[in-house]
């Protein structure tokens, strides 16, 4: 399988029996928005496919439950920080459930790893990769000037001269980032450097270091907005401690816009995932994300939502048609697949998750199924139905062409047809409502 690596700017092969993956989780001070769902569904799609190929995946994700934004939200709502994090962690977990996400093997709130964070930062100081200034600890960028900026293709001097960083007198270099913040605001923790809180950029580096025992992981994923400075700073800390890359492949997905505009509170177009899922089926969002190469920007609008609805409706309509065929005809269903369809699916997925080509394959297969069902060519029909359902399931979509008909459903459908032929329309209408609820009409 090939995936595009942000660091080397080329596709890299990944052919292993065990694959280790890390993805940055949310800061739980608010509901996540639908843009945050893109990397979640991207990794879910990748992991589901890898596991369908018999590959073991170890998937780790963090939860940032210590942050200035959490403190500010607690003050705004006159609540404790724990009340804020409990509320939004619960909402996030419900979002994952509603999206039918394959849960990470480990989902770790960073507040559970303070002592480990303390030791990690202490190691950086001992290696002279970080320095302590009156209880504030900063990473020393200049010690790694040959490496820093490679992931985001940025040069240190350009960043400084462009006035894009805040100048602090206590830092050796204005780009030096905080790995331990001295503060008395909000919940604080004891450390070798005094009371304070760990820096955001150090969380992920620590978890990868600990969970994967200092080894380079296979895939690190996240949105393009995290590429700099967050991922750049993660990478440099791991290099400082171990002298090697934190990840073999960096997978970054593109930005998401709503009706051509970036989501922002000032424009009033921010859509939380909770609100989206209250109005639309989770398959709608999955289908939308599958339409576009994951590295490209994606614009969500009413037309795209309508296209997703039409795709789902095609599946549902065909499912009804197939159920009726099963009731009215005697034949033995095959459990086999159309080998060419499955082959093409795997080719597209292994080519840097080319899901837009997979959707084209699904559309073509739906046309074939519709044609074969009309012709009643049952052997080929069910080869294609089985293949379609396999792909839909592997992509994490909950829709499928239902090929199971119970005796009750069969008897009810035949009774309905008999009553219609007898023109007892009132009774037929009652049965029709039941058949609609069962997905037969």
From Swiss-Prot:
Identify which cofactors the protein needs according to its UniProt entry: Zn(2+)
Q: Which reaction does it catalyse?
A: tRNA(Cys) + L-cysteine + ATP = L-cysteinyl-tRNA(Cys) + AMP + diphosphate
> Per the Swiss-Prot or TrEMBL record, what residue ranges does the short sequence motif 'KMSKS' region cover?
262-266
**Residues annotated to bind ATP:** 265
- Enzyme class of the recorded protein, top EC level: ligase
What's its EC? Answer: 6.1.1.16
Q: Where is this motif: 'HIGH' region?
A: 26-36
- Subunit details: Monomer.
Under what name is this protein listed?
Cysteine--tRNA ligase
Q: Which organism is it from?
A: Mesoplasma florum (strain ATCC 33453 / NBRC 100688 / NCTC 11704 / L1) (Acholeplasma florum)
């Amino acid at each position: 399988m090939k995936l595009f690596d942000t660091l080397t700017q080329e596709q890299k092969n990944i052919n292993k029996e065990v694959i280790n993956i890390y993805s940055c989780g949310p800061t739980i001070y608010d509901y996540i928005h639908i843009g945050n769902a893109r990397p979640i569904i991207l990794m879910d799609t990748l992991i589901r496919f890898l596991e369908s190929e018999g590959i073991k995946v170890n998937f780790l994700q963090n939860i940032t439950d210590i942050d200035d934004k959490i403190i500010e939200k607690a003050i705004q709502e006159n609540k404790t920080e724990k009340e804020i994090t409990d509320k939004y962690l619960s909402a996030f977990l419900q979002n994952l459930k509603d999206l039918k996400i394959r849960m990470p093997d480990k989902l770790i709130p960073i507040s559970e790893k303070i002592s480990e964070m303390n030791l990690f930062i202490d190691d950086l100081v001992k290696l002279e990769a970080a320095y302590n200034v009156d209880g504030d600890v900063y990473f020393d960028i200049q010690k790694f000037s040959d490496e820093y900026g490679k992931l985001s293709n940025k040069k240190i001097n350009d960043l400084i001269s462009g006035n894009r960083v805040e100048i602090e007198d206590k830092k050796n270099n204005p780009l030096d980032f905080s790995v331990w913040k001295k503060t008395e605001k909000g919940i604080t923790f004891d450390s070798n450097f005094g009371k304070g809180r760990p820096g955001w950029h150090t969380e992920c580096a620590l978890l990868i270091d600990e969970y994967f025992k200092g080894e380079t992981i296979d895939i690190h994923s996240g949105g393009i907005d995290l590429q700099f400075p967050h991922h750049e700073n993660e990478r440099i800390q791991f290099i400082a401690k171990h002298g090697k890359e934190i990840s073999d492949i960096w997978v970054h997905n593109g930005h998401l816009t709503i009706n051509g505009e970036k989501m922002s509170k000032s424009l009033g177009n921010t859509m939380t995932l909770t609100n989206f899922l209250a109005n639309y089926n989770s398959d709608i969002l999955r289908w939308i994300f599958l339409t576009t190469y994951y590295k490209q920007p994606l614009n969500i609008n009413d037309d795209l939502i309508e296209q997703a609805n039409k795709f789902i409706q095609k599946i549902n309509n065909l499912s009804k048609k197939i159920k009726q065929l099963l009731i009215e005809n005697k034949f033995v269903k095959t459990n086999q697949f159309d080998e060419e369809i499955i082959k093409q699916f795997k080719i597209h997925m292994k080519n840097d998750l080319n899901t837009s080509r997979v959707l084209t394959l699904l559309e073509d297969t739906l046309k074939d199924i519709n044609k074969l069902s009309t012709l009643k060519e049952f052997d080929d029909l069910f080869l294609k139905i089985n293949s379609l359902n396999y792909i839909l399931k592997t992509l994490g979509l909950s829709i499928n062409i239902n090929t199971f008909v119970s005796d009750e459903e069969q008897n009810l459908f035949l009774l309905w047809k008999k009553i219609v032929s007898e023109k007892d329309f009132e009774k037929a209408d009652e049965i029709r409502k039941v058949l609609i609820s069962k997905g037969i009409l």
